[in-house]
Regions:
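Short boundary motifs at domain starts and secondary-structure transition points
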Residues: 22-29, 136-141, 239-240
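Short, hydrophobic beta-strand segments that form beta-sheet elements in well-ordered domains
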Residues: 149-151, 190, 209-212
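N-terminal export signals
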Residues: 3-4, 11-28
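N-terminal (or domain-start) structured segment
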Residues: 28-119, 152-156, 165-196, 200, ...
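An extracytoplasmic/periplasmic, membrane-proximal ligand-sensing/linker region
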Residues: 261-319
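C-terminal lobe and pocket-closing loops
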Residues: 200-266
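Hinge/capping helix and adjacent helix->loop/strand transition within the periplasmic-binding protein
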Residues: 61, 86-92, 108-181, 246-277
């Protein structure tokens, strides 16, 4: 026996080697592996966004990780969200890439949207600013109704008409793509979104009227924030947010707190790494992501107010 290794030391060393060889507990495996459910197609925008998000999380863990992308359904995200809402819990962490449009489908009352996003936990998301803009200064009493181009009643762009109704400004809908109709002189006002919506509005010859975002952000801008004084106003902002949230990575509501904490720490790199892509929008995590995500899931009375407006104003009811 070597004088440098006692029997007790050899026993401890053997136990340590055995521990390394044994499978780790399920909880430990869940900390560095998971499945990200992604709306299709495989080469679509959501899949590319998911690949960037997965790479950031892997680097943020600072240890080998196994994040798998599972593509399901079409780009509106409803099929993927429905599946995510009904999946059973497992050892691996579960994530969903959720576009803003998916939440808007639910806001309008479409029966095919059978998910409830209110309790989901956003880790990271990409967000665009939004504002209501028009031709010239905001008219308080236009001589003729302002024309608002909307692709369809259930499109989030219809929120421009709803906003003007709440402001007491006479307006009427016209069918069309908002920016194209505005450029052709066939529309007088529209919602403008993007990383810098004010600059984009001015580039197309529009004057920013109201910032369609949170009051806190409005205080930092020369553009007044859209007043929020009723559930109907919150419903309008929820519709606009369907355009603003490009994508979010969310976890189920009942995810264990320690698992959420691990992945939230990993997501802290997201804003810094996304600065290389300023044209894609604002990268949000933490309370910023939670606040933005909450806009898309307003209280029930706000949701009902927007659906009622769609029915009474545009004669549209989801089926």
């Amino acid at each position: 026996m070597s004088p440098l290794v006692s029997p007790l030391g050899r026993r401890n060393a053997g136990l340590a080697m055995l521990a390394l060889a044994l499978p780790r507990p399920a909880g430990a495996q869940a900390q560095d592996s998971g499945t990200i459910l992604v709306p299709g197609p495989e080469d679509g925008g959501c899949a590319r966004w998911a690949a960037r998000a997965a790479a950031v999380l892997t680097r943020g863990l600072q240890r080998p990780a196994n994040l798998r992308l599972s593509v399901l359904g079409g780009p509106d995200g409803v099929t993927a969200a429905n599946r995510f809402a009904t999946q059973e819990g497992g050892n691996d962490a579960r994530f969903l890439v959720l576009p803003g449009w998916t939440c808007h489908v639910r806001l309008t009352g479409a029966t095919r949207a059978r998910f409830e996003p209110r309790g989901w936990l956003p880790l990271m998301l990409t967000w665009h600013g939004a504002l209501l803009a028009g031709r010239g200064a905001l008219p308080t009493r236009p001589l003729v109704p302002l024309r608002i181009a909307i692709p369809s009643p259930d499109a989030p762009e219809a929120a421009a008409l709803a906003a003007l109704d709440l402001l007491g400004i006479t307006a009427q809908p016209v069918i069309g793509v908002p920016e194209a109709a505005f450029a052709a002189g066939e529309a007088d006002a529209l919602i403008v979104t993007g990383p810098d919506p004010a600059a984009r509005a001015r580039a197309m010859g529009a004057v920013p009227w109201y910032l369609l975002s949170t009051p806190a952000e409005g205080q930092l801008s020369e553009i007044p924030p859209f007043p929020v004084t009723s559930p109907a106003h919150r419903g309008v902002l929820a519709a606009v947010a369907g355009l603003q949230m490009r994508a979010a990575l969310v976890m189920p509501a009942l995810t264990p707190a320690d698992t959420v904490a691990i992945w939230r720490r990993a997501a802290m790199r997201w804003p810094d790494e996304e600065r290389a892509h300023p044209d894609l929008g604002l990268a949000l995590i933490g309370t910023g992501a939670a606040g933005a995500f909450a806009i898309l899931s307003p209280p029930p009375e706000a949701t009902l107010a927007y659906r009622s407006w769609l029915d009474q104003r545009l004669g549209w009811r989801a089926g």
